[in-house]
C-alpha cells in the first residue's frame, strides 16, 4: 500500500510489517529515502508506478467527469432543462444548425478519438487500455484551455471503417482530436476526415509535436545565431510525429535537401524496399 502526501511517499508491505518512507523530487524525477539515501532505479520506478495507480483510482476512478453548467434545483429548472422547455432549443437548431453553438455545449466540446494502435511508448495496446491516456488528454484540454472533452475509444482497426465511425459523430463535437493511431493509417484517416467533416480535425501526434519541435528549433537557432535555411538536420525515426515535424520545418524554410531521415533500417531514400 502506498500513501502519497505532497512529495512524501510511504510504502507498506502486505503484512504491514515494513514501512519505507521516500521523498520524491517531482522536478528531477528522482527519489531519496527518509534518511537521505538515494533509492535504486527499480525502487523509483515502482514507487512512481504505485503513485500513478493511486492517483488514477482515488478518490474517484478515472480523471474526468461530466459537470452540469446549469442549475437543477426545482421543478422549473427541470422543465427548462428537459421536456417541455428543451423543445425550444431543438426547434431553433432545426431552423438554423449554427444555433447548436448557441444552445448546446458543442462549440466547446472536443472528441479525443483513438483506436489504441500506437499509444505513447506502449504500442498497440488496444482501445480499452488506451483510455487512461485519452482521459489524461481531456484533463490537459480542460486545465490549460478550458475545453471540454469526451474521450472516445473505438474498437476498429480498419481505416475506412474508422473514418465512417468518426465522421458520424460530427453533430456531437466542435472538433476532433485524433490520438495515438498508428502510421501510416493516421495520415490517411486525418486527410479523409478533413475532406469530409465541417469541423476542425487535428492529429495531435503529428501537429502538436510539430508545433513544439518547430518552436524549439527556431528559438535554438536564434540563440546560436544560425539560419534555418543553412543548417542540416538528421532525424531518428520516420513515424507520424517525425514526418509532421519535417513538413512544418520545410514550410518554415528548411531546404528538403538538407534533411536526412533514418529509421531502424538506416537512411530512408527513394527506392528503398526494407521496412517500406
Task: Show the residue positions of the predicted features.
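Single conserved hydrophobic/aromatic residue that forms the stacking wall/gate
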Residues: 1-13
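Short loop/turn elements that form and flank the Walker-type P-loop nucleotide-binding site
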Residues: 4-5, 105-107, 229
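Cationic, low-complexity basic patches in intrinsically disordered or flexible, solvent-exposed regions
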Residues: 19
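Tryptophan (W) side chains
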Residues: 24-26
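N-terminal ligand-binding/catalytic initiation module
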Residues: 32-201
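Glycine-rich phosphate/diphosphate-binding loop of Rossmann-like nucleotide-binding domains
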Residues: 120, 127-145, 197, 203, ...
